[in-house]
A protein has these predicted regions:
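Flexible, membrane-associating and regulatory peripheral segments of lipid-active enzymes
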Residues: 1-34, 57
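Generic preference for hydrophobic/aromatic residues in regular secondary structure cores
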Residues: 12-14, 150, 167
């Protein structure tokens, strides 16, 4: 994961939004778009192979970079919201949102930030890969805000579980 594509090639493959203007009334996109959210100590370069595959298959996509790298997970929700909006405007459909590791927690925090009745219209499905939903033991050693938020059984993780909407 922390290879060449992380620090140096993260912008080698651009986001792909085939229709940058809103769809005409009655017009339907043929492929659902995807938003890709990386994990801790990564950037959008994590998704380069996925981005190439999505474009080859005709799926609009946006891969975000969560900044600042050691910021609060809650502060990343605006980045997710903007990416979802971009994909939805390009396709006319709510996207699939994929989060890896901490990215899955960011997506859950974004869902929690939405008005209760709007989540279904904003996102088609959420997929999390390797997400520490209950936290991680490594979080107790972290000096970063987001690392501490991911502490196993920590306050932030418990609060997220209590406040997020029912699935």
């Amino acid at each position: 994961v922390f290879g060449w594509r992380q620090p140096f090639r993260h912008n080698a493959v651009p986001d792909w939004l085939p229709s940058l203007s809103p769809l005409s009334p009655g017009q339907q996109a043929t492929r659902r778009g995807v938003v890709l959210v990386h994990g801790f100590l990564c950037n959008r370069g994590f998704w380069l192979p996925w981005m190439a595959a999505l474009r080859e298959r005709g799926h609009a996509h946006v891969a975000v970079t969560l900044e600042p790298a050691f910021g609060s997970i809650d502060d990343y929700t605006a980045t997710i919201d903007a990416a979802v909006q971009r994909v939805q405007e390009a396709t006319g459909m709510a996207p699939v949102v994929v989060g890896h590791s901490m990215g899955g927690l960011v997506v859950r925090a974004w869902l929690r930030s939405l008005p209760a009745d709007s989540a279904a219209a904003r996102v088609h499905r959420v997929i999390t890969l390797g997400t520490p939903h209950g936290g991680t033991w490594a979080g107790r050693f972290s000096r970063s805000v987001n690392g501490q938020q991911m502490a196993l059984g920590g306050e932030w993780v418990r609060q997220l579980q209590q406040e997020e909407p029912a699935a």
